[in-house]
Design a protein with these regions (language model features):
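Exposed, interaction-prone extracellular/peripheral surfaces
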Residues: 1-43, 56-61, 70, 79-92, ...
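Glycine/proline-rich, flexible active-site/cofactor-binding loop segments
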Residues: 46
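Contiguous, often N-terminal, cationic amphipathic patches that form binding interfaces
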Residues: 50, 70-72, 76
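N-terminal juxtadomain amphipathic helix
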Residues: 63-65
Length: 278
């Protein structure tokens, strides 16, 4: 590995991700009746066990709540969900494919993406929620199933740093984001929050159906970390090269209006984060 790749802002460090918990992690909160990580009490204890729904089994669900009849009827595991519990689960998806591995400032866009995702993860862990994580790079998709607490955030931080190292070493475009979205649908239970940190070009129109399906019963948000040149491009013409072709052109600030509108039709929220967000 070259010294350049090991420079701060390029090589993602586990220590910096763990340090993001300072000031946000708290202890002491009511425990839900459910043993599934991320379930929080929606009503006071003893308020009853009214059936809310029967849904697909998700990683981390309590196997004791499997509904035998629905499972036998559909051929896939289904669980019962009750009104005394509600899901407080956050799934983080960090995109480390080639378009994220660059930056004109001191930090790669991919590093800021990881920092932004982990910061949201620490905030969720602080309120007692469960957190899961996925990362996509040229090698495929890595997954940390649902869990909670300090150890879970440590596992997520180590996975992201390791997967980012791999992304820097192998480069390449990687699989379509839809591959991660389909797995996310199996990992995140209904009612969960899903944060996808990617670039503005991360979603092809052919992937909209997978994104819409994920957002059908979940709260999905797309976060795009902005590079300095995205928000404040230099005033002078810049050289632009595409293979043997090249020319000078003036750059304009990136406008995400059309992307935000497109995502809104899919019931997905859009957020752009400035260079200082990571």
């Amino acid at each position: 590995m070259s010294a350049t790749l090991d420079a701060p802002g390029i090589r993602l460090q586990v220590a910096e991700l763990l340090a993001l918990r300072e000031g946000v992690f708290q202890v002491g909160r009511p425990h839900p009746e459910s043993r599934r990580p991320g379930a929080v009490p929606a009503k006071a204890a003893g308020a009853g066990m009214d059936l809310r729904e029967i849904r697909d089994f998700a990683e981390g669900d309590d196997a004791r709540r499997i509904d035998p009849a629905a499972t036998a009827r559909t051929g896939t595991p289904h669980v019962r969900s009750f009104y005394e519990d509600r899901d407080d689960t956050l799934l983080l998806i960090a995109d480390f494919r080639l378009p994220m591995l660059w930056g004109t400032g001191a930090t790669l866009r991919s590093v800021r993406a990881a920092r932004a995702a982990v910061r949201r993860g620490w905030q969720a862990a602080a309120r007692g929620a469960s957190v899961a994580a996925m990362s996509i790079n040229a090698a495929g998709v890595a997954v940390i199933p649902i869990g909670s607490g300090l150890q879970q955030m440590s596992r997520i931080s180590h996975m992201l740093a390791r997967w980012h190292d791999q992304a820097l070493d192998i480069g390449g475009e990687g699989p379509p984001l839809a591959q991660a979205l389909l797995r996310a649908g199996r990992l995140a239970p209904p009612g969960a929050e899903v944060l996808i940190v990617t670039n503005a070009e991360g979603f092809a129109e052919t992937e909209e159906s997978a994104l819409a399906k994920l957002a059908r019963r979940r709260h999905v948000r797309v976060l795009v970390p902005l590079d300095p040149i995205d928000a404040v491009p230099p005033p002078q013409p810049m050289p632009i090269h595409a293979g043997a072709l090249g020319k000078f052109a003036r750059l304009r600030p990136v406008d995400h209006t059309s992307l935000a509108q497109r995502l809104r039709t899919l019931n997905v929220h859009f957020e752009a984060a400035g260079d200082d967000a990571g």
